[in-house]
């Protein structure tokens, strides 16, 4: 570093970093988004009159004036051959973590919320750095969707310090969510508040997973749910596996049609996080086996299910009060049983598991009625 600091250098940046780069009068403008380093004391340069500039030689020192100097560490680095430099390791590509970022900062603007005509929910705001120097401050728009948009609109306020993680993208945001002079946005997947007393090295941090590992940041032990800060998408699955009683399990509800097909498979009980099995890493599925979760069944569905149970019990106990259409249904959607007085219909594919062994034997064709 000491050798580099003694050189006279200048850095020229492309318009990607300076929008008004055309007004920079020094040096040649670079059109590609890169930074180049030029040394003014370059060997073989020319002087203003066209003659080649000769390098000045330092005056010879007498032996008495020479002071022993300890070799600089940079000299050994410069002498390193290419064969001694190891090739970076290869890792498997994971689409879920591609362009994934973590941000900690302050909410710069009130959250804007919108419900679109197709039933989708969107919210947006700006997360900013707060620095003593105005020249170093910057902000990034963040977008929420779905239930997380409603959560952000309800709980997030201006000047809150929050942690968000999600996908970084450059695209047009949803309607009424455009922020001038910025195309880079983050589609938030996880949202957390920062504890007021928690130490932070800077008011705004962007850290990748590898940087966290290098800096020695380790996963904290399980704590109360209000103190948990989930930094990455995979941490949500870790928390689910380590604390299954803090999550609702909707897998059976989805199979039975009690919730919509796109409903999350798991949802935290404080409704701050949702997880889908089709987006889970490969290591998650084996660890879910044997875990006990709480199952939340919608109230309206519970009433309907209890009512259905009574109907099946009545069928088993009083089969003569029901028409049995199992033997010759012409319409596949027609009910298998129908009450002779009330007209209530029952389908075998919706029956509880205990019903099938207790059903009466199939009646003869002439005794059945077809609808």
Swiss-Prot record:
Domain of life of the native organism: Eukaryota
Region described as PDF region 2:
312-360
Q: Where is the transit peptide?
A: 1-20
Q: Which GO terms describe its cellular component?
A: chloroplast nucleoid
Q: Where is the signal peptide?
A: none
Record region (Disordered): 45-64
- Tissue expression summary: Expressed in the floral abscission zone.
Keyword Methyltransferase: yes or no?
A: no
Q: Which GO terms describe its molecular function?
A: single-stranded DNA binding
Q: Which GO terms describe its biological process?
A: DNA replication
PANTHER family referenced in this protein's UniProt entry, alphabetically: PROTEIN OSB2, CHLOROPLASTIC, SINGLE-STRANDED DNA-BINDING PROTEIN
Question: Any idea what job this protein has?
Answer: Binds preferentially single-stranded DNA. Does not bind to RNA.
Q: What is this protein called?
A: Protein OSB2, chloroplastic
Instruction: Provide the species name.
Output: Arabidopsis thaliana
Encoding gene, per UniProt annotation? OSB2
